[in-house]
Structures are given as C-alpha cells and as structure tokens.
C-alpha cells in the first residue's frame, strides 16, 4: 500500500498544500521550524486512522479534526484528502458554521472507496494473507526504561494497529512482544535445536543491517531480568545504550516487529507493505547516522 497524492487545506497553519505523485519508497519533507512538517504528518495520520477504524467495524470512526485544527481566520472548511496508488481516495473535512446565537461546527467525510479497501484488507487477512502496516512515530516518541517484569504479550494480526497512529509510541509493546516470542522460540529449541522464530529473525536481520556492531539481543534472566544486546564483544543492558542508540534501535526494531505481526504468511516479513510516518527521523542521532538513516529505512 502506497500513498500517491495528499491534499491539505486550512489545517492549522497550512492554507493549501498538495503532494502529488509521491515516491513509492521514501518521501522526505524538509523545512524550517514552523513550516508545517508535523502538521502534514498529523493530517496523514488522521486520514489513515479512518482506514484502521473501518477494518475493525463498518461504522467505526477514525480520529477527528478538532475545531482548533481549523486554520485561524479561514472561512473555508478544513479538508484532508488522500489517494493511494490503486486510485482509492477518501476525504475528511470539518467546517465552521455560524448561527445568530452561537457558533457550531459541522463535519463531512467521503469514505466510500476507503470502505471497500478496508473490506478487501479484512477479507485477505481472513484468508491467511497479510495486512498493511500503518504507523506514525511522532517527535514525542520515547524509549521508556525496559521494565524488569515484562508481561507476556498474546499477539494476533490486528495487534499491528495497537497505538499505531495515536502518537503514543513508547516502544514498551516491542519489548513485551520480543520477550514473548523469545520464550516461544526457546521452548521450540528444546525439541529442535535448529528452530528459529521467523518474526524474531526479521528483527535480527534489521539489527545486523542497521547496526553491524550489534547482535544477540535477548532477555537475560539472571542475576536479574533485563534486555541485553551484544555491542562489539561486550554484552550490555539496553538501558546502558546512548539515547541516540536506543531511539534508533527501537524505531527500526518496532517497524520490523509490526511487519512480522502483519505478515504471518511471509517467510520474510520484511517484504510486507505499509505506510510509515516518522517525525524528525534524525532525532537524537549522531551526524553519521543522520546521513544514513533515510536510505537505510528503504531497505526494511
């Protein structure tokens, strides 16, 4: 699934902007502070949230445009529109209307084509196929300290959309999932020493590709429970990595995790499809990594 066109009108500080014929692999939005980069990503997240909602229920609603999102001073409605590479388009809008006594707002959506797309995705998943990953990593994404006691995470294909577009990315769910999958893998290895979990292999492949010096990420049980990773020849706790290392590593591993959840039918889940939105992709990164990350992300 790929985005072809985006049209945004009267959304926050944006009066009218169109992104036409977007690159199918990678699009970088560059601008000075206050230019509207985050607003563009937030608008796209609102639009994609309706697709996720309609996968769950035919009458479900996605994120709404708040009255505060309508451009100040505009008498025209706020309009967000998206078109995919398969010519499927949908629109979410909100306008201000006035009465004599008070001000009211009205909303309008055009979701007919998107509803059909949502139903196709659900039907494909029910036949054992995969679903597209839709994910937004906002600038507020954080790497919370890895909890000492991780809870087992029961996973199904629709968990790929948990907190996907809400802006609440703290990566805790990644560590819980990794612990759960590693437990399953360890149980299988007792019967078959050559067994490796294909979803964990997807994460390991990403780590080796992005971080050649990193390997063997695992949950250490003794002397106390902690997520550890081998950096060079030294095994260190995840919490001891630099903020840039933690942020970068968690980002690419979480993308790989979601691809694995979304594509249980693929031998290589990294061949799955989706739309990933990342605000300030170079956040906390060393200048060398800042120069590399955009190109490397296209390899996932």
What role is predicted for each listed range?
Residues 1-173, 194, 198, 208:
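P-loop NTPase switch/coupling surface
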Residues 1-59, 224-300:
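Switch/communication elements of ASCE P-loop NTPase nucleotide-binding domains
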Residues 85, 162-271:
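Extended helical coiled-coil dimerization/tether regions that scaffold
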